């Protein structure tokens, strides 16, 4: 993901004010001769997506995936024996999390779970407000699959509280089996970077050693 704190990921700091953290980080890279080659989004562009191929592999979920040929950001999984609390424990273990924010009743049984894209405004799909006052957005599509495709739970990347998360909270309070596991963007996709250390040697051979070094959970919990 971006190295220097901006979405366009400029190779330098361009905000017009001094950033001491940027300066110190860059100085360390220069001091130790470290080159940063940001290949994350290129790996997303693989077919199939190289990041989520790795996530699914290292979660051990290949056997549970359904509708694998479905286009778009959503990946579906069906589990024979899964609950909200079991999913919490599994994600914490496999993703090496310090904790997890979730919505749902711990004992509720989950059958169909969807790994979805980032739930942010104006991402993936956006249209201006129509004449009837409706503005289409990706979060609305996620609500649709939970309503129409019997999706019990989602695992998103980035989230905001006022769209899908509020829908799921309301659903749970109304007695429905719905859940969300907010593991965080970096935590969700880091296993995909681990997978990169598997396929890069297949491309370049053994000429250059390849190692996966996890950055760890960005968050702490009390």
Report each predicted region and the residues it spans.
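Active-site catalytic microenvironments in core metabolic enzymes, especially phosphate/sugar-handling
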Residues: 1-222
């Amino acid at each position: 993901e971006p190295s220097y704190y901006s979405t366009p990921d400029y190779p330098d700091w361009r905000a017009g004010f001094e950033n001491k953290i940027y300066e110190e980080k860059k100085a360390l890279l220069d001091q130790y001769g470290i080159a940063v080659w940001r290949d994350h989004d290129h790996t997303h562009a693989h077919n199939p997506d190289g990041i989520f191929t790795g996530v699914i592999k290292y979660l051990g979920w290949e056997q549970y995936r359904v509708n694998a040929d479905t286009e778009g950001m959503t990946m579906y999984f069906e589990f024979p024996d899964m609950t909200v609390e079991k999913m919490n424990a599994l994600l914490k273990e496999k993703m090496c999390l310090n904790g997890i924010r979730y919505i749902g009743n711990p004992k509720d049984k989950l059958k169909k779970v969807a790994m979805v894209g980032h739930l942010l405004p104006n991402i993936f799909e956006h249209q201006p407000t129509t004449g009837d006052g409706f503005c289409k957005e990706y979060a609305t599509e996620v609500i649709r699959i939970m309503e129409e495709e019997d999706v019990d739970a989602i695992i998103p990347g980035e989230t905001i509280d006022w769209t899908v998360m509020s829908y799921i909270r309301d659903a749970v309070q109304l007695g429905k089996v719905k859940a969300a596991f907010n593991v965080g963007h970096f935590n969700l996709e880091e296993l995909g970077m681990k997978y990169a250390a598997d396929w890069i040697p297949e491309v370049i051979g053994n000429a250059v050693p390849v190692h996966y070094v996890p950055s760890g959970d960005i968050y702490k919990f009390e």
